[in-house]
Amino acid sequence: MPQLDSGGGGAGRGDDLGAPDELLAFQDEGEEQDDKNRDSPVGPERDLAELKSSLVNESEGAAAGAGVPGPGVRVHGEAEGAPEALGREHTSQRLFPDKLPESLEDGLKAPECTSGMYKETVYSAFNLLMPYPPASGAGQHPQPQPPLHNKPGQPPHGVPQLSPLYEHFSSPHPTPAPADISQKQGVHRPLQTPDLSGFYSLTSGSMGQLPHTVSWPSPPLYPLSPSCGYRQHFPAPTAAPGAPYPRFTHPSLMLGSGVPGHPAAIPHPAIVPSSGKQELQPYDRNLKTQAEPKAEKEAKKPVIKKPLNAFMLYMKEMRAKVIAECTLKESAAINQILGRRWHALSREEQAKYYELARKERQLHMQLYPGWSARDNYGKKKRRSREKHQESTTGGKRNAFGTYPEKAAAPAPFLPMTVL
């Protein structure tokens, strides 16, 4: 079995990186896999070997960044076999002894797709953060840094953290991870959903192809509490025209943006300025002032009753006596009794009431000389008569007002000039 080269070069020196008697069987729980896929070097084991080689690269970066004299491990090529990858996995376990074996076993369990190939491998013990951008040319893959362990208060995530990876690629100066930002400043962190894993798979070959166009939204200079009624404004998502991946933006950030006209940007009714309420008051006052003159005109014009005739004067005088004699309270029945008694009167008795009626008419004519019964009973006829008079005078009546419109002046004639 080929071993990893140490600083001196011998494979059988007995170093701690890979011993021939310590081999781990990573497929002891994969009983559902076929023997054909297990024996083929081009099948899932090749993808597994590439993922394990990326772990060795991370261990090299950890040793170089911490200043610890590394063992000088070098990778011969990306197309190594499965036995060498098993030795490298054992090396990574020795370099990171604090990782639990259960999390490594869960991370190395890759689900089978319908085509039989591994679409992606999810590592529950890593967050796959890239703290620094690549320093070499565009054609080389960046050297990954050691993975950050999950903090004791955070549950292990089953989906790779995509937003922190984008942030470190896009910013020229490295900034702390968004996990720390969310704890210090209270910035809302996007939720990781399992459906992202089916569309964006992270492998050792696709780590260097992520675009540099996505950044974490920075909090405002003066953060506002949600109780004041205003929402924080986040920058609109912008992406390069040739970017293969869109920017990840949580729906709550888009809904909370302070865009005018958006339903989420409508303030609470309690903080609406009083100027809007004051603008409505003059309009209500105008409506009231327009309705008041009409009511005043109708109230000023008293209803003039017609003078009473002889029978009405008799009824006015005898009604109280009839009500006292009879037990009936209905007005119609009382009027019938009064009518019978009126016709039973003699001519001399009726002449007395006729004389009273004549005097009543004379008094009414003196009080109201121009009065006519049509003022009380002919309102519809009076309206039609007013319309007829206005039509004969030539005035044009407006449909919404009571005043006649002025005749439109003819437009002046403009002479045409030929150019």
UniProtKB/Swiss-Prot annotation:
CDD domains listed in its UniProt record: HMG-box_TCF7-like (cd21996)
Tissue specificity annotation: T-cell specific. Expressed in triple negative 2 subpopulations of T-cells and both the gamma-delta and alpha-beta T-cell lineages. Expressed in Il7 receptor positive innate-like T-cells in the mesenteric lymph nodes and spleen (at protein level).
Annotated GO CC locations: euchromatin; nucleoplasm; nucleus
InterPro entries the UniProt entry points to: Catenin-bd_sf, CTNNB1-bd_N, HMG_box_dom, HMG_box_dom_sf, TCF/LEF
Disordered: annotated segments: 1-111, 134-200, 374-406
Knocked-out gene: effects: Aberrant expression of Vgamma2 T-cell receptor in alpha-beta T-cells. Reduced frequency of DN1d cells, a subset of DN1 precursor thymocytes. Decreased number of natural killer receptor-positive lymphoid tissue inducer T-cells. Increased expression of Il17 in Vgamma1.1 and Vgamma2 gamma-delta T-cells. Loss of Lef1 expression in Vgamma1.1 and Vgamma2 gamma-delta T-cells. Loss of Cd27 expression in Il17a expressing gamma-delta T-cells. Double knockout of Sox13 and Tcf7/Tcf1 show a reduced number of DN1d cells.
Location in or out of the cell: Nucleus
SUPFAM superfamilies: HMG-box (SSF47095)
Record Gene3D superfamilies: High mobility group box domain, TCF3-CBD (Catenin binding domain)
Keywords for the protein's UniProt record, in alphabetical order: Activator, DNA-binding, Nucleus, Repressor, Transcription, Transcription regulation, Wnt signaling pathway
Molecular-function annotations in GO: DNA binding; DNA-binding transcription factor activity; DNA-binding transcription repressor activity; DNA-binding transcription repressor activity, RNA polymerase II-specific; RNA polymerase II cis-regulatory region sequence-specific DNA binding
UniProt keyword annotation of Cell membrane present: no
CTNNB1-binding: annotated span: 1-60
Chain ranges for the short sequence motif Nuclear localization signal as given in the UniProt record: 379-385
Key word Magnesium present: no
Main localization (coarse): nucleus
Compositional bias of kind Basic and acidic residues: 35-50, 86-109
Record field: compositional bias (Pro residues): 143-158
Disease tied to this entry: Defects in Tcf7 may allow the formation of epithelial tumors.
Role, per record: Transcriptional activator involved in T-cell lymphocyte differentiation. Necessary for the survival of CD4(+) CD8(+) immature thymocytes. Isoforms lacking the N-terminal CTNNB1 binding domain cannot fulfill this role. Binds to the T-lymphocyte-specific enhancer element (5'-WWCAAAG-3') found in the promoter of the CD3E gene. Represses expression of the T-cell receptor gamma gene in alpha-beta T-cell lineages. Inhibits the developmental program of IL17A effector gamma-delta T-cell subsets via regulating the transcription of T-cell lineage effector proteins.
Family membership: Belongs to the TCF/LEF family.
Official protein name in the record: Transcription factor 7
Species per Swiss-Prot/TrEMBL record: Mus musculus (Mouse)
